[in-house]
Amino acid sequence: MSTPLKVWQRWSTPTKATNPDSNGSSHGTGLDMVTPVSGRVSEIQFDDPRILPEKISELEKELFEYQHSMGLLLIEKKEWSSQYEALQQAFEEVNECLKQERNAHLIAIADVEKREEGLRKALGIEKQCALDLEKALKELRAENAEIKFTADSKLTEANALVRSVEEKSLEVEAKLRAVDAKLAEVSRKSSDVERKAKEVEARESSLQRERFSYIAEREADEATLSKQREDLREWERKLQEGEERVAKSQMIVKQREDRANESDKIIKQKGKELEEAQKKIDAANLAVKKLEDDVSSRIKDLALREQETDVLKKSIETKARELQALQEKLEAREKMAVQQLVDEHQAKLDSTQREFELEMEQKRKSIDDSLKSKVAEVEKREAEWKHMEEKVAKREQALDRKLEKHKEKENDFDLRLKGISGREKALKSEEKALETEKKKLLEDKEIILNLKALVEKVSGENQAQLSEINKEKDELRVTEEERSEYLRLQTELKEQIEKCRSQQELLQKEAEDLKAQRESFEKEWEELDERKAKIGNELKNITDQKEKLERHIHLEEERLKKEKQAANENMERELETLEVAKASFAETMEYERSMLSKKAESERSQLLHDIEMRKRKLESDMQTILEEKERELQAKKKLFEEEREKELSNINYLRDVARREMMDMQNERQRIEKEKLEVDSSKNHLEEQQTEIRKDVDDLVALTKKLKEQREQFISERSRFLSSMESNRNCSRCGELLSELVLPEIDNLEMPNMSKLANILDNEAPRQEMRDISPTAAGLGLPVTGGKVSWFRKCTSKMLKLSPIKMTEPSVTWNLADQEPQSTEQANVGGPSTTVQAATTYSFDVQKAESETGTKEVEVTNVNSDGDQSDINSKAQEVAADSLSNLDVDGQSRMKGKGKARTRRTRSVKDVVDDAKALYGESINLYEPNDSTENVDDSTKASTGETGRSDKAISKNGRKRGRVGSLRTCTTEQDGNESDGKSDSVTGGAHQRKRRQKVASEQQGEVVGQRYNLRRPRRVTGEPALSKKNEDIGGVQQEEGIHCTQATATASVGVAVSDNGVSTNVVQHEATADSEDTDAGSPKRTDESEAMSEDVNKTPLRADSDGEDDESDAEHPGKVSIGKKLWTFLTT
């Protein structure tokens, strides 16, 4: 809301003062007003009193306009304060949003840590798998040793077979020798043979027959043997088919292993992602370190600024010792508020830390459970592998047995060679599987490292974001009123940073442990590679041995074939010899034939029986082995499919979870960036407002300099007035009265040290900069008093005695119509001194602008030109921010002191007019000591008529009536201080006024404090005496300028007033300025006079002395005001 302001445009540009009491100092030229005034106080002549009422009425109108603008400014102040509260609410909402996002970040960090723990468990499982593989390698070595042993045993068996063949050849040779002996006997008996040739020929025919029969039987035997060979070949085919089935099952197993390898590759990819995350976390840690460096640099800058503020504080403390009590109270309140905020912040931090620790523990437990489950699965797999290996060993044993049974035959050798080749293929496949498993383990290790890197990176980024958010909060909260809170928050930030560092150290330690584990794992893999190389060498040795065995077997086969051929040749030879010796050996051959046939049949039957038994056993063994293998394969297939489905489901679930988490993290980052932009924009807006406020403050400082020059001009006018009085002393009628008048010397009232004020105003800019840091210190650091009680302090003590309605607090609930008759009634009793005092209103506002710190901008802006109206709104905002704390304590006294100089001045003008008429045309009675109520009645009648007009002029704004009323009552107080020319009849009216105003004092003390105090009330006003005591403590800075200016005004025209500010007696005797101000009718005046004397003698101001200023009306005869003396002079 920007309301138009009515600016006071009557005074002209002041000239340079030439008063000898002003210490010869001059300040700023000031801004020119719009319209100059032709007449001034120095030009007032007593021979033309008709001009005085007009000028006084003009001045009063200008005061009305000034007060109206003041009310508008206060309304604008209230609106700015409401806007400030709205901004504070928005800022709190932003802080709540930041807290929620921080919690979300903590949850994301917990999830990432859970993943990290799961990956660690997977690493443990993989290590266990590596150990299992080592065990499997050991078992393979044992199997190789067993194979070597079996090969050696088979070689020994082959050697035994060779030896048996050699023994048989020896037996054949023995038989040949026996045949040679028989041939010798045949030769011997050749004669007998010749003899019996005929018998031999006869027998020869019979032998031929028998031979043919033997050949037939031999052919039948060969047919049976061929059938047996075919049966053996079919059995071998069946064995080959079984082996092919086993090979197919092995292929299926390999396919499943390939699928498992693919899943392992996926896990390795995840490990790589974790490593990338780790890299990101390291980068985030570097950013956090940079931010910590920035924070340390900012802390150093703050320390330098604090040193500067300490220097300024020392200079201010020398000037503001009297305000220490107020400072202590404010500091205590600030400490309480800061302590509460710090406690709340600490509680929030503790709660967040506890939640974080609980989440971490839960995640660790879940990861441990998952690791245990994975370990159990690995153990199951190991048991299955062991079972498979046992079955394979059993199969190998069965094959070994079969090979041992067929050692005597060539087909048995071929079967053994095929079995050896199959086992070699199986070994090669197992080696390939080991290599693939090794690759999978390496990939899994890389995936785990990548996941760990990701987790660390995410945690680092979250920590960096948290630190940035905290820093932004601290920067927003670093104001001048909350410096101590900011320092405490900095200490808490340091603690949090230390905690983060400890956490980072723990993470680094964990990373180092993982690196050590990785190195140990790599060492183990190197050992496995060495073992694998050894195994390969052993396999090469085995293959060499196998090749040697094959060569040896081939040689043996060739040797056996040669032996068979030789044996056949020998048999043919024997047959030929037998044919030659048929006749001789007919009988022996028949006997031997019969014996051989029997033996051959027995051996044949035994061989057939053995072959059939072996066939049955082999078939039954093969069927059982095949059934067992089929069952095992089916069970393995089911288990493998189940495991495959589980692993695929787990992989899909992990992918979905990872995608969701990535989306959530991206959304959170976008939100944080948006909020950062909003916070930056708000911060820039606040900085722009601060710069505008500083510009306005500079303008106000210039205006204060201008007002000082006007005050010096007013002092020069006072000197002219005194010169005019001295010229009138030559008059016969006026000389006697003026000779009796004793004017108080202006030298007794020390003028303000303008050089000090200039220094204070020159230091206004650095104090404005300090206000950005601590408005409380800046508000307390602008007093005008020095180490001693200066001229301002004396003026304060003087004006506290001059206010007749100081202890009474007019109620804001009064209507303007009710207030105006009272003010006019009191104004009609005023004397001629008001004509001079009315011209001092401007200096009243000047001194109040110089002395007050919280409200000086509001007091001065009303005298600014039309061109400065645009700056007033911005100034009112700063005043609302700086003066809210002061309004809680001394808002009542300030409101009373602002506006007590208006309506009474109007009333005193009428009295001056009446007195002028009486001077020239009417005979007026002299002073009478008794009270007369007639003058009071006349004055009240005159005031009521004028009140109606003023009510009509002011009641246009209903909202401003309460404030205007309070300002008018304050105005009447100062007019009471200035209207000293009343007769004795005025005393009764003054007493009645005081009684009426004391009745409503308690109500107004509470309402006025709440009218323009835009903060929540922190205390409740009590009795009038207690409220005045708080005024004297908290509102010293505001009251001081008001009373000082009033004292200056009265001193400038030579007016000496009593403690109550109301003249009740006119004494035509010589006045003693050093006497005490006492009232013969009231004993309470003794205390008040003591307080007055203490203030004059530069002693501290007491609150109790001000509480009783309005209790009496009498004045000491030796200190009668110049107004009263002028009144007696005019009436005589």
Swiss-Prot record:
| Motif Nuclear localization signal 2: positions | 693-700
Q: Which InterPro entries match?
A: CRWN
Q: Which GO terms are recorded in the biological process aspect for this UniProt protein?
A: nucleus organization; regulation of nucleus size
Q: Where is the composition biased (Polar residues)?
A: 10-28, 861-871
Description of the deletion phenotype: Reduced nuclear size and altered nuclear morphology. In plants lacking both CRWN1 and CRWN2, moderate dwarf and leaf-curling phenotype associated with endoreplication and strongly reduced nuclear size. Plants lacking both CRWN1 and CRWN4 exhibit slightly smaller rosettes. Plants lacking both CRWN1 and CRWN2 or both CRWN1 and CRWN3 exhibit markedly smaller rosettes. Plants lacking CRWN1, CRWN2 and CRWN4 or CRWN1, CRWN3 and CRWN4 are extremely stunted and set few seed.
Q: Where is this motif: Nuclear localization signal 1?
A: 379-386
Which terms in the GO cellular component ontology are assigned? chromatin; mitochondrion; nuclear envelope; nuclear lamina; nuclear membrane; nuclear periphery; nucleoplasm; nucleus
Q: What is the tissue localization of expression for this protein?
A: Expressed at low levels in roots, leaves, flowers and flower stalks.
Q: Where is the composition biased (Basic residues)?
A: 895-907
Region of interest: Disordered: 1-31, 849-871, 883-909, 924-1039, 1061-1132
Is Phosphoprotein found in the keyword set? yes
Bias (Basic and acidic residues) occurs at 849-859, 1095-1105
Q: Write down which residues bear the modification named Phosphoserine.
A: 774, 803, 865, 883, 908, 1093, 1105, 1112
Q: Which residues form a coiled coil?
A: 73-714
- Top-level taxon in the UniProt lineage: Eukaryota
Localization recorded for this chain is:
Nucleus membrane; Nucleus, Nucleoplasm; Nucleus lamina
> What membrane topology is annotated for this entry?
Peripheral membrane protein
Keywords of this protein's UniProt record, alphabetized?
A: Coiled coil, Membrane, Nucleus, Phosphoprotein, Repeat
Functional description taken from the UniProt entry: Component of SUN-protein-containing multivariate complexes also called LINC complexes which link the nucleoskeleton and cytoskeleton by providing versatile outer nuclear membrane attachment sites for cytoskeletal filaments. Required for nucleus structure organization (e.g. size and shape).
* Subunit-structure text: Core component of the LINC complex which is composed of inner nuclear membrane SUN domain-containing proteins coupled to outer nuclear membrane WIP and WIT proteins. The LINC complex also involves nucleoskeletal proteins CRWN/LINC and possibly KAKU4 and the cytoskeletal myosin KAKU1. Interacts with SUN1 and SUN2. Binds to KAKU4.
Q: Which family does it belong to?
A: Belongs to the CRWN family.
Please identify the protein, giving its name as recorded. Protein CROWDED NUCLEI 1
Taxonomic source organism: Arabidopsis thaliana
